[in-house]
């Protein structure tokens, strides 16, 4: 016959020994080799933000205000033509995003449009761009527990958010991406574009870890978004 009081003492002692481990798993973000923060996993935004200026107080220049007035989500949203979202809008898409860390790069694979964003850790921006792109050229480096990302080289086709905030080819986006805790990722943006805005402005997005999730196939055809299974 088992000694139940002794069993209870052993189980209780084991539980106490596990408390610091469990707390560490929750409070301290994981690291990869070389003590670089581990951002990998499938993430999804915690709160959808259609507009980065919901109160309508964006610091437009006259050019920026005129471009914003022309924006119509039902007519000329670039995404209606199945074009890439651009940055920062890609980071505000309300669909899962998977992050991979490989030598020299951080890769972000967004289910929306099945778009791949590359953040280069092993080079600088070119002195001149052969062509300007939707998502620009992203260069990253680690500063403590944050990934600092500098992105330039944009074309002027995309919107900054889902309601039509415009930008020019002078757009410069700076991000500080940090894993706040095991289940939370935070991205702080600074937006600079002297043609569209009278001053730099900031935005923030929070993401939550989605264990067990996978990125699904996404089809954009004839201006209609079709989602396939998760």
Residue ranges and their predicted role:
Residues 3-10:
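N-terminal Sec-pathway targeting helices
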Residues 2-3, 21-230:
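PEST-like low-complexity, intrinsically disordered acidic/proline/serine-rich tracts
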Residues 10-21:
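Bacterial N-terminal signal peptides
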């Amino acid at each position: 016959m088992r000694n139940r009081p002794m069993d209870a003492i052993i189980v209780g002692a084991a539980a106490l020994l596990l408390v610091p481990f469990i707390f560490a798993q929750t409070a301290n973000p994981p690291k990869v080799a070389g003590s670089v923060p581990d951002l990998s996993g499938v993430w999804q935004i915690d709160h959808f933000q259609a507009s980065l200026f919901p109160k309508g107080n964006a610091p437009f220049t006259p050019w920026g205000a005129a471009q914003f007035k022309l924006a119509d989500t039902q007519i000329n949203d670039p995404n209606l033509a199945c074009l890439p979202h651009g940055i920062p809008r890609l980071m505000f898409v309300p669909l899962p995003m998977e992050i991979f860390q490989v030598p020299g790069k951080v890769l972000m694979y967004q289910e929306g449009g099945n778009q791949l964003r590359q953040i280069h850790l092993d080079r600088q921006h070119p002195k001149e761009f052969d062509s300007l792109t939707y998502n620009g050229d992203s260069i990253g480096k680690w500063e403590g527990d944050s990934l600092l990302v500098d992105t330039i080289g944009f074309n002027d086709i995309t919107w900054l958010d889902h309601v039509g905030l415009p930008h020019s080819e002078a757009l410069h986006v700076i991000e500080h991406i940090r894993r706040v805790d095991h289940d939370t990722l935070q991205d702080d943006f600074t937006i600079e574009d002297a043609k569209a805005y009278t001053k730099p402005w900031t935005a923030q997005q929070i993401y939550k870890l989605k264990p067990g999730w996978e990125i699904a196939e996404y089809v954009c055809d004839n201006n209609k978004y079709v989602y396939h299974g998760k």
